[in-house]
Regions:
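Active-/binding-site microenvironments in catalytic and ligand-binding cores
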Residues: 1-216
């Protein structure tokens, strides 16, 4: 049993290096207070987090519209697809056949090794829109896709990234949106988990939240 989420701290990388994280002591026993507590200020799309449909669809689902059963999964598939700086994930990368009953698709690229370097947020890989379209059309059982780089959107190809997010998250009458988990910790996992529990930070009306992920 392991966590597939990174710890959040003041050095957590952010997409485009554009969001500040500030975690500080609100009260501190070392300073004479009766208890310890923290003050936390950050964007909701920080660290290992999930993008929900509302993030790119004005009428999309928000957090509280997903019941508890939508966060526990027994059919999880891990695929290894090494990606370089600014490389775009395409349908052609999926040489390993995906199982038709997969609920969570985890893509391990190895880009996590750059997480404490500028290139992690500035030159990250991205995902082409065709992947979202293809997965939704051919693998209707997939509820979530996750990966070990900072965003579905390559920072150097932002317009394509916006289209890609919509390909996964926008509602249509043919198939359900696929939720997106970005910035996963995958360095300690090499095989398909038997079970995955995704625990979202419960914020009303959220279009995305940090998640704690436990793999069994």
């Amino acid at each position: 049993m392991i966590f597939l989420s990174h710890l959040i701290d003041n050095n957590t990388p952010t997409y485009g290096n554009s969001s500040d994280i500030k975690i500080s002591h609100a009260t501190c026993m070392d300073h004479g207070d009766t208890a310890n507590s923290l003050s936390i200020k950050m964007n909701n799309h920080i660290g290992t987090h999930i993008d929900l449909p509302k993030h790119f669809d004005i009428n999309g689902k928000v957090l509280e519209q997903y019941p508890a059963c939508e966060w526990v999964f027994n059919k999880v598939q891990l695929v290894n697809i090494p990606l370089e700086e600014e490389e775009m994930l395409s349908v052609s990368h999926f040489k390993k056949k995906l199982r038709e009953d997969t609920e969570v698709l985890i893509i391990k690229t190895g880009f996590e090794k750059f997480r404490h370097q500028e290139s992690y947020w500035k030159n990250n890989p991205g995902v082409l829109p065709e992947v979202g379209t293809w997965l939704r059309k051919n693998f209707g059982s997939i509820k979530i896709i996750g990966f070990d780089f900072i965003s579905l959107t390559c920072f150097q190809r932002r317009e394509i990234g916006r289209i890609s997010h919509r390909a996964f998250l926008e509602s249509n009458k043919n198939n359900e949106p696929i939720r997106i988990i970005e910035d996963m910790k995958l360095s300690e996992i090499d095989t398909d988990p038997k079970k995955l529990i995704v625990l979202p930070l419960m914020i009303k009306g959220a279009d995305g939240v940090p998640v704690s992920i436990i793999a069994f």
